[in-house]
């Protein structure tokens, strides 16, 4: 009887095992068999970490308290205003495409920014009124444009554009009261990168950066009256890093980053009248990789990459 009962139990277990359904799932890369399904609660908990948004500082609000940030809300990054620490962000732009570079008017609330459509990389420059969120396209709508830089008076924007021939990175100057009357101030002689770095205090000259490669860059000054350009940083027939940063307070010199005087990228100052160079960070044995100067050009801060830490 016991033997009979044991046999029945064994047959019952075997039949139960064979009756169990084999779970198979194909996710496109792996075929999973008899792997337990992932509970929905785990997916929900994971989404809190996968959907964390970052925010990038874009500039201070010149007309009121707060600052502008860009952060993803929906599918693309847009511009927002945060009026105080811990305050709610107020969305300013509502485009289907992400905004690119952003630069604030020196005295007013207007903002110039770049944006392309459909990933074409033919970015256009727009003027934004943050109070009404209204925008105006300033460029032609077809060429590739970038690097908008306000003049100190705020009535012109220097920018890079391919509008002359569709490929060359020329530098132009745009009057805000008539953007269609943009004026070519530097015609690119080659396919390298050219762009405006700073305006002189009286807006009569523009500091121009020419990036050729990671090991070769030069800087020029363009006189806006004569349209003549003068090479001031770097040698015509040799390679070195010369990243133009800004004019000084009295337009007598240029701050720049260079590797000409040591093994590191150093912060230096070039005096225009004498061509004398003073290395500011010569006692720092690390690369200088960031710089910002105050609006009145009286103070500046720079960043050093110290053993991988900024």
Predicted features by range, described:
Residues 83-87, 129-133, 175-179, 223-227, ...:
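Short loop/turn segments that connect beta-strands within beta-propeller blades
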Residues 51-70, 89, 96-114, 125, ...:
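Conserved beta-propeller blade repeats
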Residues 4-13:
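Sec-dependent N-terminal signal peptides
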Residues 17-19:
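Boundary at the C-terminal end of the N-terminal hydrophobic targeting segment
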Residues 80, 217-222, 266-270, 310:
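Beta-strand-rich binding/interaction modules
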Residues 31-55, 86-89:
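A short helix->beta-strand "capping" segment at the edge of beta-propeller domains
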Residues 303-310:
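Short, intrinsically disordered, charge-balanced linker/junction segments flanking boundaries
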């Amino acid at each position: 009887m016991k033997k009979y009962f044991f046999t029945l139990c064994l047959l019952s277990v075997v039949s139960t095992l064979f009756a169990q359904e084999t779970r198979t799932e194909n996710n496109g890369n792996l075929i999973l068999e008899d792997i337990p399904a992932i509970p929905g609660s785990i997916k929900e908990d994971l989404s809190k970490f996968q959907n964390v948004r970052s925010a990038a500082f874009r500039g201070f609000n010149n007309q009121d308290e707060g600052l502008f940030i860009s952060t993803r809300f929906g599918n693309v990054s847009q511009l927002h205003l945060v009026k105080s620490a811990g305050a709610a962000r107020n969305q300013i732009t509502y485009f289907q495409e992400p905004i690119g570079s952003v630069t604030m008017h020196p005295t007013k609330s207007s903002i110039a920014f770049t944006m392309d459509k459909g990933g074409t990389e033919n970015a256009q420059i727009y003027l934004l009124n943050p109070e009404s969120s209204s925008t105006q396209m300033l460029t032609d709508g077809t060429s590739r444009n970038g690097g908008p830089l306000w003049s100190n008076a705020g009535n012109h924007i220097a920018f890079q554009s391919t509008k002359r021939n569709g490929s060359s990175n020329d530098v132009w100057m745009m009057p805000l009261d008539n953007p269609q009357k943009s004026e070519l101030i530097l015609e690119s002689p080659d396919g390298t990168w050219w762009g405006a770095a700073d305006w002189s205090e009286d807006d009569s000259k523009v500091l121009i950066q020419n990036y050729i490669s990671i090991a070769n860059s030069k800087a020029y000054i363009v006189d806006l009256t004569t349209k003549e350009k003068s090479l001031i940083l770097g040698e015509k027939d040799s390679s070195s890093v010369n990243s133009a940063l800004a004019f000084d307070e009295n337009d007598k010199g240029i701050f720049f980053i260079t590797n000409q005087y040591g093994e590191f990228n150093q912060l230096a100052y070039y005096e225009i009248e004498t061509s004398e160079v003073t290395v500011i960070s010569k006692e720092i044995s690390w690369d200088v990789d960031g710089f910002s100067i105050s609006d009145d050009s009286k103070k500046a801060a720079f960043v050093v990459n110290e053993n991988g830490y900024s």
